[in-house]
Each structure stands twice: as structure tokens, then as C-alpha cells.
Amino acid sequence: DGLAMKAVKMVFENLPSAYENGANDPKAREEMANASCMAGMAFANAFLGVNHSMAHKLGAFHHLPHGVANAVILTEVMRYNAAEVPTKMGTFSQYQYPHALARYAELGRFAGCTGNTDEEVFENFIAKLEDLKEKIGIKKTIKDYGIDEKYFLDTLDDMCEQAFNDQCTGANPRYPLMKEIKEIY
């Protein structure tokens, strides 16, 4: 967890300047390279989740760049994962329910978010992520990237099935149903 948490903190601290100033801020770019390396080491040992599975399909079907695809759906997936009682839970049988809300709140606190409850910290963390996305030009919705709505809807069932079967999905804190993946998209 330490590598992932430190990487998140470094992204918040450095991505806006690295994006806005590019080569004129080599320190921010260096810190982003380090954050990327740390994040890679973290997920190589812990795997990813349904956000990544869904992003794979947005890239494959609609040619969205992988980072953009991950970013545009991130907060919706976080809200899905943070639900108190999931529809289905079975991948990690040692847990009655996932503890995603508490874990997101822990990460939010580490990134500087405050609140009186985990729910408040989580909502502040979501707001901080949305602010970061806006600063670096991530659009609000998939549709905002110019994807034809009819084509998107025509491919949605295939995307959902493939995202459900993606190797990353099994590591998600909540094991999604295909209809839930569709609702997130």
C-alpha cells in the first residue's frame, strides 16, 4: 500500500505542473516518472480492478488513450466500489464485505482530504480527483470525447462482457455483475 499511496500523493503534487509546464518543469516531470514507477510496482504486486478492465475496452472499442479511459471513469468506479453492501461478493471469501470506503478514505486523508467521517473524506477525495482531472484536461464523460452514441450503445454489451471477463476484474474490491458494469459506463 505504501508505494501506491506515495504515488497518489506525488501525482496530486506534480501532475498539474508537469502537464501545464511540460519541459519547463523538469522536476515535476521527474516526480511523475517516479510516481509512475512506484504505481507500477504497487499494481504489479496487487493487481488492478474493474476500472482498468473497463478502460481496456474503451481503448479497444473506441480508441480512447488508456490513461484518459481510466481517468474518465475513475470516480464512478470508486463510488461503485465504496457502496456499503454490494450486490455480489465472492472473490475474497475472507471478507464479508469489501472495505473500499474505509480504504478510499484512508487514501484521501493521505492525499490531504479532511472530513468528520469516512463518507465525508471520500466525497472530498472524489472532489479533489475531479478537480485534478479538470486541471489536466480530462473531460467529464465518455461522450465528451466525440464517441458516436449509437456506436457506443451498439458496442456496450460486448464491452461489458469483455470487461467482466478481463483479468483485472477479479481483483476489484466488489465483484461486479455485467449490468453494473453497464451502469458505470
Per-segment meaning from a language model:
Residues 37-70, 165-171:
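Glycine-rich phosphate/pyrophosphate-binding beta-alpha loops
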Residues 61-64, 68-151:
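Gly/Pro-rich interdomain helix-loop hinge
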Residues 1-3, 27, 120, 143-146, ...:
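Short coil/turn segments at secondary-structure boundaries
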Residues 4-7, 32-40, 54, 74-78, ...:
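Short alpha-helical scaffolding segments that buttress acidic/His motifs in well-ordered protein cores
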Residues 1-9, 48, 68, 98-101, ...:
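Alpha-helix N-cap/helix-start motif at coil-to-helix transitions, marked by capping-box chemistry
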Residues 1-46:
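Carboxylate- and glycine-rich phosphate/diphosphate-binding segment that chelates Mg2+/Mn2+
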Residues 20, 42-48, 87, 116, ...:
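Intrinsically disordered or highly flexible coil/loop and linker segments, enriched in small
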Residues 149-185:
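Short, amphipathic C-terminal "tail helix"
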